[in-house]
Amino acid sequence: MRKWALSCALLLVLLLTTLPDPAKKLQVNAEESSDEVGDFPKVEEKLGAVPHGLSTDSEVVQRESESISRKTLRNSAEKFEFQAEVSRLMDIIINSLYSNKDIFLRELISNASDALDKIRFLALTDKEVMGEGDTAKLEIQIKLDKENKILSIRDRGVGMTKEDLIKNLGTIAKSGTSAFVEKMQTGGDLNLIGQFGVGFYSVYLVADYVEVVSKHNDDKQYVWESKADGSFAISEDTWNEPLGRGTEIKLHLRDEAKEYLEEGKLKDLVKKYSEFINFPIYLWATKEVDVEVPADEEESNEEEESTTETTEEEETEDDEEKKPKTKTVKETTTEWELLNDMKAVWLRSPKEVTEEEYAKFYHSLAKDFGDDKPMSWSHFSAEGDVEFKALLFVPPKAPHDLYESYYNANKSNLKLYVRRVFISDEFDDLLPKYLSFLMGIVDSDTLPLNVSREMLQQHSSLKTIKKKLIRKALDMIRKLAEEDPDEYSNKEKTDDEKSAMEEKKGQYAKFWNEFGKSVKLGIIEDATNRNRLAKLLRFESSKSDGKLVSLDEYISRMKSGQKDIFYLTGSSKEQLEKSPFLEQLTKKNYEVIYFTDPVDEYLMQYLMDYEDKKFQNVSKEGLKLGKDSKLKDLKESFKELTDWWKKALDTEGIDSVKISNRLHNTPCVVVTSKYGWSSNMEKIMQAQTLSDASKQAYMRGKRVLEINPRHPIIKELRDKVAQDSDSEGLKQTARLVYQTALMESGFNLPDPKDFASSIYRSVQKSLDLSPDAAVEEEEEVEEPEVEEKESAKQEAEEPEHEQYDKDEL
């Protein structure tokens, strides 16, 4: 009986091997028609088919065999030309990022996550948009077709209409392209491609043909396809499996990109770049499992032949006791494997999260996948009337347009979640503009879910959240300074603490170089936190030796009896170091703060005092350096000169001439009134395109000429005035000295020609030249008319290309 069964089994196997293989036939047909447009099956023909997300590799190949091997745009599709900016951008991406092809997967997953965020938000007010069954599952699926070299990434997000496909994939905001190109030309980190909104086009690093299948609830299912050759096509999709809703991107990989068909490679990339995406990412992965199968018939027969003969009774007993013979074999199966099973970082306890996990999460959040870690972070929970969890980061670098669009940008770097549901990143009221460089997440359990963004923005809880976020943000920045050994002494630290702090050496200086302007803007805009922000200020000074110092450090070095904090504004440290306003201050060992940023002029209009110390601009009136016992006598001695000089400069707008207490080597300087503009501020305002000239004249304030009574020039002028106060030459000399002082004090000369003429007259006098010495006239020589004609003839005979070269030059 068993031998008969064995014979039947062998015959069946033989018959099966002679049958044709349908899969191979399909493959041959696909290869033969690779350059032709076939008839694609209609959607109606596929009703009842297994959902695409759950089908096996062989079913996918069979279902799509007519389209997957073709890499030409369908003849029936509506064709478009790429916008010029897009074509230029794709060339840049392909040529510049070729060595970092991995980023394409990161960008596609990031886009899929954004689409899922959008549909989840829409579902808050309309649950029907989510759909039912598999369509309602908010997840990202990655699938491989090694045979046809296709990598597919699918999401069940909001999807795209036909118009969306044209707008989002065929055109691009010029500003995004320009910013990306500028970043590339300045040697910036091109890993930041996602920040410019051009990440999708990185697919052409690995694919030479791309299909984007998308279904939006408000439109039919469409296919967008392109070979990156300057054009793309869009057609209604009647051959792919209905998506229900969402987008599937099919990348037909280049030969040199086969590594992205390896499951291990994709798993590594997801772990590296997308581990903290807020939606599950699944890979259709192969897996080996142990399976119990019946033992082969041949093995059973061999065992029978080797056994000794038994009696009929023994045989019956053995049959009753004998169990089916099985063996364990390895079997390959495919199933969906979850690649990102990490819990949202901000929901975990700060003690459970490692530095590496914080850094990875920051890179995912900021779409910045460079090597730089965030400078600092603050992870905290708030309890009470308003409960929320938050995670804030200080980026390693300032965004490329942080201050260019400071007052116009509406988008925030903070993502607002309500009960783990992403709501928006456009709530600019969560943080003030001066802290807009911070990145992070706020997740509230108090805010309502089922209201519009506009209503949510007016919710009273937001004010409480904002207040706590500001306080935590400023504490985070303060701690960044405290942990920097360049900022504070290590004397009271243990060896382990010193070692840890060495790693953060120079961190606050780096922060200040990137975001110092934001701290200054905060002092201008936020009166409530002005003192907290003032503690974060850093600057160079006359005693800092190139290092940055704080106001607290300055105060700790103030001289006994010094009541004011001295500062000077200008365009550069080098210019300020040579300023005549520092002469007496330096001689008497006073420290002076250098402010060289244009925003510093505005800053000091709001920062009037710090720790009960007033700020004093040393280029303005009111400088006090202690009592001078001889000052009264000097004023009396030079009274005739100061009165005469004031009259001599009557047309120059000088309010008064006074004895100075701030000069040592310089004969005189021009200072402004306490509330008037400094010379530096005048230049800043004059550079404004739409500045008001009448306002400038008013805000300029009074100017005072301060003279150095100990300088030989001033003493000689006093004597000359006493001898002949009506001398025109003396008046010209006095005006020249004033104009020189005006220029040395940082002001622009109102009449440079008059100043130059005065200089030339002085030079003439020093060379013993007569004031009436005339300039020698040049003899006029008439050029022969023949030469002009020759010249014209020569020009006419010049070749056209030479003339073109001249014009170009």
UniProtKB/Swiss-Prot annotation:
InterPro entries: HATPase_C_sf, Heat_shock_protein_90_CS, HSP90_C, Hsp90_fam, Hsp90_N, Ribosomal_Su5_D2-typ_SF. It is found in: Endoplasmic reticulum lumen. It holds the Pfam family HATPase_c_3. Glycans are attached at residues 111, 410, 450, 617. Residues 789-809 have a biased composition (Basic and acidic residues). The record marks 453 as: Important for ATP hydrolysis. Keywords: ATP-binding, Calcium, Chaperone, Endoplasmic reticulum, Glycoprotein, Nucleotide-binding, Signal. NCBIfam families: PRK05218.1. This is Endoplasmin homolog. It comes from Hordeum vulgare (Barley).
